[in-house]
Amino acid sequence: MTAIRKKSLALTDLFMALCASRCVTFGLQNVTPTDPRYRGSHVSLAAANDGYAMMQALIARGVIGDFRRGDAAGEPDLLRFGFTPLYTRFVDVWDAVQQLVEMLQNAEWKRPEFNREQVVT
């Protein structure tokens, strides 16, 4: 295993562990395989609803991820985060989770500006 892949796994492991300990009470659930053989450098968190607004609130805080809308069959919204091991630092992971927790604690996603859907090109 290369050093880059090892760092990728360490970054995603850290993010998943921090989210498990700090975000689960807010209804977010990791849906990324914990077995490193079955995951890349992304982590997806399921949100029962309001995923779009949550991601917009995170982007406003400087945490850039992307959003995948759930479907009518009950699939949840997904907040997806990528970890590029060439330049993402472990402190960046800690900071991102702290921003996520603060956004959730303050219910910032409920603000009107985060609930206006944008056109994506």
What are these regions (language model features)?
Residues 60-65, 69-121:
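PLP-dependent enzyme catalytic core of the Aspartate aminotransferase-like
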Residues 14, 18-22, 57, 99, ...:
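Alpha-helical structural signal in soluble globular domains
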Residues 1-47, 66-75:
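Conserved small-domain helix->loop->beta segment predominantly found in fold-type I
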Residues 50-56, 91-93:
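Short, conserved charged micro-motifs
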Residues 45-49, 83-85:
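Short beta-strand-to-loop capping motifs
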